[in-house]
Structure formats: C-alpha cells, structure tokens
Swiss-Prot record:
Gene Ontology MF, one: protein dimerization activity
Note on domains (UniProt): The transmembrane domains of the small envelope protein M and envelope protein E contain an endoplasmic reticulum retention signal.
Protein's recorded name: Genome polyprotein
Extracellular side: 1-445, 494-495
Native organism: Dengue virus type 2 (isolate Malaysia M2) (DENV-2)
Note in the entry: Isolate M2 comes from a patient with dengue shock syndrome.
Length: 495
C-alpha cells in the first residue's frame, strides 16, 4: 500500500482478459494497477540517476602562480626568451619596455621583455555529457498485501526494488506469494542532451546550454586530460602589469566561484546523491501480468468475529483504509468485506485491496476500498458477528467522472504510440479497446452504474440504430460512434 501516502496517485484498470497494462511513472507520483483475478500493485519511480557521465571539458575557477621569472634585452639585442616558455605549465607574456643609460643599456629605445609564471589550478568545475543510455531508473513495486506496517512510504520487506536501464528495459520482479510481473519500459527524460551540458561544481550541478558552456572565458582542458598540465586560455585568469625595465609583476585573479554562481542564476539545478546526478522525467511501461496470481484464493471465508482496530481513515484519493483484526478461528482465511447501499440490496464501490486475507489470528490487516459517493454501509464478516459500519463520502459524481477522464486522456497522450500493438490485426483491435477503456471508462461507469449487462447492450444497439437512420450526416456519425463505443465497453469491458 505504498501509494496511500503519496498525493499524486493514478489508478489504472486492466481490461478483462487482458494480459498487459500501460502505465506512466513520474517522480512525485504513484500508480496503482488493478486487473481481474490479479493482485493490486503499487508502482513508484523513486530515482533517476545518471551513471558515470563522460566529461566534456574542465574549467579552472581558482589558481595560484609560483616561480615567476623575467628576462629582458636592450634595444637591437634581439628578442628575449625563457626555457619556461616551452613548459605547458607556465603562462608567459612578451612585451616592449623603454630602455636607456638609466637601466643598463647603451642605446635608448624599446627593448624586449618576457615574464613567465607557473600556473597551478586549485579548484575546477566540470561539464559532463549525459546520454540516455547512462540513465538508470529505480522503481519500487509493492503488492496490496494488507500486512501491518505495509502502509505509506514503507520501503522494507513489502516492496521490490527494480532497476531499469535502456540496455535492459525489460525486467521481471518476483513478488513473494504473488508470482512475477514483467515490465517493458521506455525511458522519456524530456531533455535534449545533445544541446545540454551538466555543469558540476563541487557538490552542486546545473543543466546549461552546450554553446554557453563552451564559450566560458576561463582556463580549460579537455575532459580526457587527467594530468591537468595542458590548460588552454590560462591568461584569462592572469594579469601582467606594466613592465619596468627588467621587472614585471604578474598576479592571478581571485576565485571565480562566486561569479559562476551569479551567472547560473535561473539555470535548472540538478540534485546529487552519492556522486550520481538525479534527474526528472517519466517512464512509459507496459506491464505483463500473465504470471501473477492472487494469494489465498483457496482459503475459505472467515466465519468468526472481526473488530475495527482504528477509526476508518479517508485518503486524499477518494478511498478509505480499514484496519481490522480477526478474533475467530480457522485462519488463514478470506475477509468477507462488501460495501452495500442503505437497503442492503446492491453491492457498491470496489475493493482496491483484492481478495484481502487474514494469515494469523489477532493480527491487524489493512484493507483499502473505494466507497460510492453519498451514504453506504461497509459490511465486514458474516452473521451473527457481522460488523455494519455507516460511511458517507462527499463529492460530485459528475466532477469525479470528468476529472478521471482528463487524467486518463493525459496518460494516453504521454503513452503515444507505445500504447498500440501494430504487429497483428488482433493487436490493433485490442489496443483500441484498451484506449477506449482507459479514456472513457469513467464516463461509461458513471452513466451506466447499476444498469444490467443486457440493458447496456440494448442501449448501445438502439443508439447505433438511431444513428444509422438519421438524415443528418454529423448526427448520424456521432450517434453511430457513441453506439459502437457503448457496445464495445458493454461487451468487452467489465467497467
């Protein structure tokens, strides 16, 4: 029950008889999947890391100068030179200075002077290139087991952590007691890494434009250079003062770290953890659930008494969490739990925790359910010790219907072409059915709530027949489409 503690939660229902479900995982959100005769699973994308990004260029932002040497020549004696000029570690500058009798020359005129100083970089920053194949996604999969301490953001024994990379996009997660779920994921970072560079300075990193990074007026060396002795543009951090006869002072500018922080104002800051860079983005995953099975299907129903351990908790997702404790004998057994109308005639709402079970007597079990809007009864156990709890859920069915439809339409837009199976004609039609169910399932469920299966089919046939006999082309097409969608959802989908 990992998703209960996360505000941004999406419910995805599988089509009856379907073997796969498409989901979209984003940071800060959680997805709960439900399918007929399959366990309810929670999926959360907890981390996206860039592993071992390649270094494009290193910039020096703080340096020191040592071993300053100056050589000068009188007029007509040629150009002065120093051996240090051949050493890449030194920064040198040639100048001309006035010479004469007062400073050791027999002729008056311009004489040459050269000054060199050893340039040592003390602090640098790096620009790294991140490729999609360097990204690693960490997902936690948690079945709705109902066990104690399995509620909220628990990452202990109840969840299975799996890693997704572009090289191994298909991964299987073994869920103890529930079988195996297969995930086929397609990473989508939303960033164009060809135009962006990660600028890393100490324990902070920013995402900057590639050309801006390459144009920085600072000493630099290629990313492949591990020695640090072949810095280019060393003169950008060095100032040679005006020469005087045989002397020339040279100074180094102070640390450029503050100036870089100012220049990076407004740039996207990237979080870091254990030396790895953390990114946002989303994963489009196709779940294959044919190897999953419900736990405790062979158990009999619990016949003893239940008690509610804590007050029923309402979540921010329109669901409730009931914490019950079995006081009877015969465990392990299934928990009889239903949500009924006030007349006890119709079963309403749904169980998010499918097939809740008790494994041990007097051991609390968490059950998540979604009650209908308005008044209803939550019935736990069987007679004579049956619990009957009244519950009222606030809200508007129409508003909830349109909100759910918008969320599902957004999900389908993100999934794009990965939601479709074009390998066969049957795959195309199956994909169409899943798309209709994902987007219009909420509207269909609200419009035909409580209507029998045969009546749904009859309504679909009538709407289609009216459309085929309409004289208005636009009305005819609209009614036929609505009728076909109604027929399909009525026949193929247990919405």
């Amino acid at each position: 029950m990992r998703c209960i503690g996360i505000s941004n939660r999406d419910f995805v229902e599988g089509v009856s008889g379907g073997s796969w479900v498409d989901i979209v995982l984003e940071h800060g959100s959680c997805v709960t999947t439900m399918a007929k005769n399959k366990p309810t699973l929670d999926f959360e994308l907890i981390k996206t890391e860039a592993k071992q990004p390649a270094t494009l260029r290193k910039y020096c932002i703080e340096a020191k100068l040592t071993n300053t040497t100056t050589e000068s020549r009188c007029p007509t004696q040629g150009e002065p030179s120093l051996n240090e000029e051949q050493d890449k570690r030194f920064v040198c500058k040639h100048s001309m200075v006035d010479r004469g009798w007062g400073n050791g020359c027999g002729l008056f005129g311009k004489g040459g002077i050269v000054t060199c100083a050893m340039f040592t970089c003390q602090k640098n920053m790096e620009g790294k290139i991140v490729q999609p194949e360097n990204l690693e996604y960490t997902i936690v999969v948690t079945p709705h087991s109902g066990e104690e301490h399995a509620v909220g953001n628990d990452t202990g024994k109840h969840g299975k952590e799996i890693k997704i990379t572009p090289q191994s996009s298909i991964t299987e997660a073994e869920l103890t007691g529930y079988g195996t779920v297969t995930m086929d994921c397609s990473p989508r970072t939303g960033l164009d890494f060809n135009e962006m560079v990660l600028l890393q300075m100490e324990n902070k990193a920013w995402l900057v434009h590639r050309q801006w990074f390459l144009d920085l007026p600072l000493p630099w060396l290629p990313g492949a250079d591990t020695q640090g002795s072949k810095l280019d543009q060393k003169e950008t951090l060095v100032t040679f003062k005006n020469p005087h006869a045989k002397k020339q002072d040279v100074v180094v500018l102070g640390s450029q770290e503050g100036a870089m922080h100012t220049a990076l104002t407004g740039a996207t800051e990237i979080q870091m953890s254990s030396g790895n860079l953390l990114f946002t983005g989303h994963l489009k995953c196709r779940l294959r659930m044919d190897k999953l099975q419900l736990k405790g299907m062979s158990y009999s129903m619990c016949t003893g008494k239940f008690k509610v351990v804590e007050e029923i908790a309402e979540t921010q997702h329109g669901t409730i969490v009931i914490r019950v404790q079995y006081e009877g004998d015969g465990s392990p057994c299934k928990i009889p739990l239903e949500i009924m109308d006030l007349d006890n005639r119709h079963v309403l709402g749904r169980l998010i925790t499918v097939n809740p079970i008790v494994t041990e007597k007097d051991s609390p079990v968490n059950v998540e359910a979604e009650p209908p809007l308005g008044d209803s009864y939550i019935i736990i156990g069987v007679e004579p010790g049956q619990l009957k709890l009244n519950w009222f859920k606030k809200g508007s069915s129409i508003g909830q219907m349109f909100e759910t439809t918008m969320i599902r339409a957004k999900r389908m837009a993100i999934l794009g072409d990965t939601a479709w199976d074009f390998r066969s004609l049957g795959g195309v039609f199956t994909s169409i059915g899943k798309a209709l169910h994902q987007v219009f399932g909420a509207i269909y469920g609200a419009a035909f709530s409580g209507v029998s299966w045969t009546m749904k089919i009859l309504i679909g046939v009538i709407i289609t027949w009216i459309g085929m006999n309409s004289r208005s082309t636009s009305l005819s097409v609209s009614l036929v489409l609505v009728g076909i969608v109604t027929l399909y959802l009525g026949v193929m989908v247990q919405a």
